[in-house]
Amino acid sequence: MYLALRQAVLRRAGLAAALVAGAITVTGAADWPEWRGPSRDGHSTETNLPGKWSPKGENLAWRIPIGSRSSPVVFGNRIYLNTPTGDPANTQERLVALEAETGKIVWERRFSLYLSDVPQHRSSWASPSVDPETGNIYLFTVAAQLVCLAPDGKVLWNRSLPDEYGAVTTHGGRTTSPIIEGDKVILNALILAWGDLNRTGNRYFAFDKKTGQTIWIASPQTRHYDTNYSTPIVGTIDGTRALLVGGTDGAYHALKLNTGERLWSLDVSKRAILNSPLFRDNVAYLTHGEENMDTTEMGMIAAVDATGSGLLTTDAFKWRTRGFLPTFASPVADAERLYTVDNSAIVGAFDLKTGAKLWEKTLGTLQKGSPVLADGKLYVGTENGKFYILRPSATGVEVLDEDVLGTPQAPEVIVASPIIADGRVYVTSMDALYAIGKRVPRASRVAPMAPAPMAPAATAVVQVFPYESLLTPGQTVSLKARLFDGKGNFIREEPAAQWTVEQLTGAVDAKGTYTASPAGSTAGVVKATVGAISGTARVRVIEPLPWAWDFEAAVAEAPPAWWTGAPGKVFQRTIEGAGKVLMRPRDDTVGRRSKVFFGQPNLSGYTVEADVRGREQRRQRGDVGLINERYGLVLFGNGQKLELHPWQAADEMTARVPFIWDAETWYRMKLRVDHLADGSARVRGKVWPAAEAEPAAWTIEKIDKIPHQMGSPGIYADGISDVYFDNLKVYKSQ
């Protein structure tokens, strides 16, 4: 009934074409469908919220022993929480659906993690998001897998960004929470893909929320410092619906929502931006806790005129206050003041018009979560395990309630931000989820819509949809040319576009249907031209197994164009005694641990083989390996061992044996995955000197009880020294 009312409202309003209308958000008055709430600013309009409670019972509705480092979301009578589960040998991320009234588990779905550098204790980093139109839930795992689930928990579609885009995950675990806006689900990830995405960097993705197809990919950054988890917010800037987000380059960026084009960028920090901005009335409020770009001072809180364009300068600041360090927490604001919490759990208040610091109060010593503002109160938890309810004013702050979760000797760490829904405050520690206050379900309502777009002007952008396709020989894809004006307003789909192909075999007809050639693999773009304006879609065509590369026919250094994660990392070179090979040179830059994928993400039942060789440089030896269905077989140079794992950072999930190998000798590696009748997988690896006959016995083996069912084949190298590959083969297992 709850969801049906929303859908009926949409139909009556004639808002099915969400693309035309821009962003339309329809929620219940008390829903909290995304990490920062229905308005994406950490603010709730609810009243009569609890000002006092106790973990021992007062105003405590329930507590369940399911914790997380991410915040839950609430939609209707369901709470959705991303949480780790399983012992260290079988850790997974799981999405749990809870009954809001009681905390009872309604359903859960588990996701095995793969090929990630994120350690187990940092899994379940990102909050899920709910689409108010359909009730579908979106989850982005620390393995960089985006999953769409129906309200009953059925998986509708998923995108594996490592296989498809060479997504890189790191030890820090930083993973962005997706947002749903109109017909799009939007997130960012660090990737190295193929074609024009041939540089390691942070990219912003818009996927069709119903199908998972790629709408656009934006690359506003020119450099990369570190990973981040700044979740985008949405605002209307002079009639342009825009995303505002902090980048891994130390800049804030504003992008056109419908096209991904950059409106402006503003450099503010010498490290990645981790928190999210605020936006009101063409003013963006930006914060960070690192060294400033133009001074050696640390930390910044600023108000910026968001109506600019291009690369903004310091002239864009309406005011700027330095010296307060909110690295992790995102700000909140009422009509007069901005509130945020620094790294040391000091909450501060700043005048919204001038930036002047009004007061500060120490809450603890460590801070990760963001505050939430509602009913004239600030709700904030600290990493020291204390949860506060505060009443701020212009002159100071009153502590209404202060509680320790757990015990003073063993406090429950609070990393997640609190949320508010249906009269309750929900607090998540690493150990438990608390529901505070009496639940008061509210009547559904339609939230204020985004301002109606201006009448479309002349065509400024041709967007080809879907933006990315992966085909087999002879397969077709129907492409559409979408026209947008200079403010990102949708005009129409253009039936008379002129279609051409570039770097691709195959052909495209006058209606935009591309047909791949009947044989061979290729990669390139299909271009649509309307007048003097063109747009492109990226297309890869990969032939069925078997594949074999000995690299002898190579005429250029670059590897095959359809390989993902290869540009700038691996090169076809000639070396003495071996002829032409594939080389991963020594590399100290971002993405030193390189994974290169060369197949479809849904492949299974195959074997990968290759000759490999290392090299000692500066008394260091790199690592080299193969990838099969999201399992890695890796020879460690310095460690002189062989490992077999689905998730390298998960030590208890890794099989390993000592293996002495010479840096100047070629070895043959072989990796095979077999799916067994009991639902488990037998993963086996073999290594032997390439000049010798293949031994009958496997060198290493692992039985995985939470197996991966599919994944692209690939190669792996840790570039602390040169490593080499030759005679690479992928074929169906017999």
Named regions from a protein language model:
Residues 443-486, 534-546:
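Short S/T/G/P-enriched beta-strand
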Residues 694-724:
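Flexible glycan-contacting loops in extracellular carbohydrate-active proteins
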Residues 24, 28-463, 480:
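Noncatalytic, solvent-exposed loop/strand surfaces
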Residues 54, 556-581, 589-592:
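Extracellular glycan-recognition surfaces and repeat-rich motifs
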Residues 30-34, 538-566:
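Extracellular carbohydrate-recognition regions
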Residues 576-578, 584-652:
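Secretory/extracellular carbohydrate-interaction modules
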Residues 648-670:
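Short, aromatic/His-centered strand-loop micro-motif at the edge of beta-sheets
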Residues 551, 608-610, 665-677, 683-687:
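Short tryptophan-centered beta-strand motifs in secreted/extracellular beta-sheet-rich domains
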